[in-house]
A protein has these predicted regions:
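Short, hydrophobic secondary-structure boundary micro-motifs
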Residues: 26-27, 79, 112
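Interdomain motor-coupling "hinge/lid" segment immediately C-terminal to the ATP-binding subdomain
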Residues: 1-72
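Generic structural signal for secondary-structure transition and capping sites
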Residues: 22-23, 75, 108, 186
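Extended hydrophobic/aromatic segments used for targeting, binding, or gating
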Residues: 54, 62, 85-89, 93-96, ...
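A cross-kingdom feature that marks ATP-driven nucleic-acid transaction machinery
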Residues: 98, 105-239
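Short acidic, hydrophobic short linear motifs in intrinsically disordered regions
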Residues: 74-87
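Residue-level marker of alpha-helix boundaries and capping positions
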Residues: 4-5, 89-90, 168
Length: 239
């Protein structure tokens, strides 16, 4: 065991990384100034460059609209990315797939696809119409979440840098876990399935394939120790 003091220090450093991110310009700015306001300004500049490139790919602005809604979509706890929420109802599915393909190829996002039947292997059972999007850099994700507000209104910075783990930051941690899993060479999958009453769904945040085994991952942002989805998944696929 590392001990509580070491664990607290490591988690504090990790949350600082979540706030700054890994973009070289943002890291350099933090090392030079130790000022998150300056870091946030740098990250806003990077996002502007991204959106300029998105506009060159699609002058209707729809790729930017997809990208901009990622934090709101993750924070809503929806079981999939809602294209209509980002673009409205008038975009046909073929055009949507093209826009998403261009966004994915830009390497600015990570995508997790729903595995309809993890028992037969995730790549064999993915649902290409059911997916989630994550921003590829945790620091850009946090800036993007408050892109239209002033730095001082971005409460995520305050929550991350306090020693109190906040249960409402689950989606922020989910995004950084997606980044870490992708950086380690994993393809991202997730899984939802109905509860025994059928009124709600369990959701396993990520699934990894290891040989003939499926490894479920549930992301928690606070000291909350219950993990009903993980327990139900293990029971469902224990045989």
């Amino acid at each position: 065991s590392m001990g509580d003091a070491v664990t607290r220090k490591l988690m504090r450093d990790f949350r600082l990384y979540m706030a700054v991110g890994g973009m070289p310009q943002a890291v350099c700015e933090y090392l030079e100034t130790n000022n998150l306001l300056d870091v946030d300004r740098v990250k806003r500049g990077i996002i502007q460059l991204y959106e300029y490139d998105f506009y060159r790919l699609d002058q209707s602005g729809r790729i930017s609209m997809l990208f901009d809604t990622i934090p709101a979509q993750l924070s809503s706890n929806a079981s999939r990315f809602q294209v209509a929420s980002a673009l409205g109802d008038n975009v046909d599915s073929e055009k949507t797939l093209q826009l998403i393909s261009e966004l994915r190829e830009s390497k600015t996002i990570n995508m997790a696809y729903h595995a309809n039947d993890p028992a037969v292997g995730m790549p064999l059972s993915i649902d290409l119409k059911k997916y989630k999007m994550f921003v590829a850099d945790t620091g850009l994700f946090i800036t993007l979440a408050f892109k239209d507000k002033d730095f001082t209104e971005n409460v995520i910075y305050q929550k991350l840098l306090s020693d109190k783990l906040d249960a409402n930051l689950g989606y922020v941690y989910e995004n950084v876990v997606a980044q870490m899993l992708t950086a380690a060479g994993n393809k991202l999958f997730y899984y939802t399935f109905p509860t025994s009453t059928g009124k709600h769904n369990y959701e396993v945040d990520f699934l990894l394939s290891r040989g003939n085994k499926v490894c479920p991952i549930e992301v928690k942002s606070s000291g909350y120790k219950r993990h009903a989805s993980l327990d139900a998944f293990c029971e469902k696929f224990s045989s």
